[in-house]
Amino acid sequence: MVNLEELSLKRNNMKRTETTFTDISGKRYQVANINEENSESNRIELNRTSGFVIDTKPDDLSHKIEIIIPQSILNNNNNNYESINLYIGSQDAAFNKLDLQLKNIKSILNVGIGINNLFTKENSDINDGFIINYCNVEIFDDVNFNIIEKFDKCFEFIDSNIGGVENNGILVHCNAGVSRSATILISYLMKKLKIPLSLSLEILKSSRPQCKPNQGFLKQLEIFEKELLF
């Protein structure tokens, strides 16, 4: 049986609290009494916010793929790995002119969706003549997307633009630099260096810990590994 008198006593002994909430316009309010209704008269307006979360740590650096191959599987097919000057990053990294210049990145493989190429020949006047060679391959970060059919075009672009006399670098990026770009680079290293999926994935994660192909892409990488017949 509910004791109404006891409940009333507990209610009266409850401590006042301050509840803060934000409306869709970004206004922040505080209601000082837990027993009061959230009416306009009971609100104390606080400083306005942006209405969205502000990223205080922009992910705007390209990460070099540091290739380390165990001596046990080092062979004539993959002993030239030191000349592979590959980078991975998010869309922010593709806009970081200073970082691209410092790392001698001359080509960018854009496998994201809706990301503009900033340093094109058409924009060279406003970028002090800085020009990047681009290739766009639209890939959706969807477990059902057939990413294997995009491999050949991506590999061809990488092979055509990497290295050279100046050891030019290539940045492979998507929107977040986590799933799509990682999958392309994992598959490229598997084929180029004739190394297993597990090692290629380990190399990517050691260079950029955020790398995490979605489950559908991982399944396709397993299929691709079998096709390579190591």
From Swiss-Prot:
Keywords: Hydrolase, Protein phosphatase. One of its GO terms (cellular component) is cytoplasm. Disulfide bonds: none annotated. GO terms for molecular function: JUN kinase phosphatase activity; protein serine/threonine phosphatase activity; protein tyrosine phosphatase activity. The active site is at residue 174. Residues 78-230 form the Tyrosine-protein phosphatase domain. Belongs to the protein-tyrosine phosphatase family. Non-receptor class dual specificity subfamily. One of its GO terms (biological process) is regulation of JNK cascade. It catalyses: O-phospho-L-tyrosyl-[protein] + H2O = L-tyrosyl-[protein] + phosphate; O-phospho-L-seryl-[protein] + H2O = L-seryl-[protein] + phosphate; O-phospho-L-threonyl-[protein] + H2O = L-threonyl-[protein] + phosphate. It is an enzyme of class 3 (hydrolase). SUPFAM superfamilies: (Phosphotyrosine protein) phosphatases II (SSF52799). Has a dual specificity toward Ser/Thr and Tyr-containing proteins. This is Probable dual specificity protein phosphatase DDB_G0283417. Its EC number is 3.1.3.16, 3.1.3.48. It comes from the Eukaryota.
